[in-house]
Amino acid sequence: MTLFHFGNCFALAYFPYFITYKCSGLSEYNAFWKCVQAGVTYLFVQLCKMLFLATFFPTWEGGIYDFIGEFMKASVDVADLIGLNLVMSRNAGKGEYKIMVAALGWATAELIMSRCIPLWVGARGIEFDWKYIQMSIDSNISLVHYIVASAQVWMITRYDLYHTFRPAVLLLMFLSVYKAFVMETFVHLCSLGSWTALLARAVVTGLLALSTLALYVAVVNVHS
């Protein structure tokens, strides 16, 4: 039973990444090592973020939720956008190729570093726990989030981007950076359960993805 539960969680967490890699055409471009390089960049960026947070934003131990402190901590996620831009700038090819390489490498590195050990240790436990299913579903939401963020970075860094599109792209980037903070604050204020919070995050990420996709299609069509 424990191995079956672990297998379900593992498949739910990792197979969408594998399917994305195969169906996006990255395997035809031999982009595996490009994704690995993106993952290494992810590790470097996260190390810099942790050092920055540990230095300037020590852990809040009070009983009251620190909105300003959490907002400032969320601002550090801008480093992820800088890292994604660095990865895409080092890869030659079409826009969609750069976006998928950066997003898939980034999201896979996060999946391995933040969810691999908890799944291996926890999902193989004697007692069944829904939180590991939730963790696996959340990894798929993270994949969509990083694809969206990569597309936004790609659009804003185009030198020929029409000025009419720039405010919309900047707004979507702002929402991507502070989405986690807004969701955490909303969950804290409304005292939402774990499944409700996961559903809310999936809905918000989906709406952000659809908005970014519509803008991406408009940008590509205008510049084609």
From Swiss-Prot:
Concerning Pfam families, the annotation shows:
DUF2053
Gene Ontology terms for molecular function: ribosome binding
Positions on the Lumenal side per record topology: 59-66, 125-129, 188-194
Q: What is one GO cellular-component annotation here?
A: protein-containing complex
Judging by the UniProt lineage, the source's domain of life is Eukaryota
UniProt record, GO biological process: multi-pass transmembrane protein insertion into ER membrane; protein localization to nuclear inner membrane
Where, in residue ranges, is this chain on the Cytoplasmic side?
22-34, 89-98, 156-164, 217-224
Family per record? Belongs to the TMEM147 family.
Q: Which PANTHER family match?
A: BOS COMPLEX SUBUNIT TMEM147, SMALL SEVEN TRANSMEMBRANE DOMAIN-CONTAINING PROTEIN
> What is this protein identified as?
BOS complex subunit TMEM147
Q: Which organism is it from?
A: Rattus norvegicus (Rat)
Q: Which gene encodes it?
A: Tmem147
